[in-house]
């Protein structure tokens, strides 16, 4: 998993971040019948018409650039600071395509037809992977895309992270590319061979690692100055000089269209204008594009907006071709449709959860939350369908574990679509009572039977311990507060006292995370926190989040079975290992998993193309080369 921990305002509750996260209007959730499981899946909002037949016309397509998402980086070797879906998917990948393309409509899976290479071939006990580049891809200056361009990217990645690991966003120290690669060979112009230091899971390496490789034009970029000679980039000192030159050029936003570096592309579009102040830009088709579908739209124009309100006003006025529907405007969908737009929403492939702190000793919470029945009881108090109806305006999908119920992926286990702990206050009370707690629905439950035997509270929980603890949550967007307020209310109905405490996202991740950033004091007196969530890669292992030593394991969850399953997902050869990992974590509840909100895309009814090319907008992918006007 290439995990991107995010403020909910950026990724977790809205996929696109600021684009959707204006808080929806308040209101209590509409409850399902207590104790009645439901396997009905939500997710889709609106519909996509079939591709129009008949004459196909050209014209300028304008699309809405959400607030705060203006491109700040152009080099396809992306720094951590610029490692965002908007910067990469909507901007860079229109010009430079990754080795393997992922995103097939709403499904987070590989799209072979849009990949620069054929499927990789594994050998040597899953320690060697051979890749054959497709012959159709050429750079815009007519030169072919070769194995040397892949090697160039790899050597520049090594040079970048040698200076600072933050210079490449996908980098995980000791893991994957480049640290686990012993050698890269280019036996032919179309063949690249990666030899690894240890056997890996092929699915993980393809989805998480090879998908981040973006061939770069060595014949045009392997230099250290504008007029300097081409250098041997395989020499580390030269690679460093080249990286410093390219990264400096990437920081010069006002030269994006004048610098000849950025005109050498292999994607469907080239950059024709860029406003460094506003982030507005235009693109035109690359006539040398060797992909499966040449662009029909002659001009793609990104129109920046300073607020969701301004963007929605443009949609309502019909002045933008492709945009989005902010969550707080979901109820105005009929107005949007009457303004001449198609509307379709779907959840992104990510997971949100409330973190449990397994190390918080306040009130013996560490011992309380270590009991599986406690985590199961809390899960029974969350009304996912009610949240989707009341807080998401119906635009959302269930998620009961680290792999959401929707969208489905090749790695979605069968049990991901069924809630193992359906909303039921009665079931929560039953679990607590059967484990030695005295229930007080007008106050706070207490442990009546201390001990580790059947019907007792569990190890380290003294008699008389109250079932009371705090929950720290992010103030933005307001939808988080609505969810945790409802949870606290339902918990009170079962005699569980949850003290809510709000804070801003940056404060939470600075002072309440574990491990804490260097030089910051760590506040460990929190039982639960809701800061947002994680964006899944297409290979959805939770490595780094729920394994014991994970760098993003804020709650110190450490389960030997989970550790073994997560490890097998990455280094084992079992293609279904990640399914077993997800199934166990869904049952074991290392955190309280929450439903996912839809990203709702809108586009003019006279703009058409394959349904998948519009569905993929909900996953923050952009494939305008497939579009055309019908009128």
Question: What is each model feature region?
Answer:
Residues 37-39, 603-631:
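Long beta-strand-rich cores associated with HINT superfamily self-processing modules
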Residues 48-54, 376, 388, 497-520, ...:
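Extracytoplasmic/peripheral linker and loop segments enriched in polar/acidic and small residues
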Residues 56, 170-246:
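Surface-exposed binding/hinge segments that line
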Residues 61-124, 264:
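N-terminal lobe/hinge region of extracytoplasmic solute-binding protein
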Residues 105, 213-294, 430:
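Gly/Pro-rich hinge or "lid" segments in bacterial periplasmic/extracellular proteins
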Residues 118-165, 187, 193-195, 311-314, ...:
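Aromatic- and charge-enriched surface segment that lines or borders ligand/interaction sites
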Residues 257-260, 280-333, 497:
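Ligand-site clamp/hinge motif
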Residues 282-287, 369-489:
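Append "and occasionally in soluble cytosolic enzymes with long acidic Gly/Pro-rich linkers
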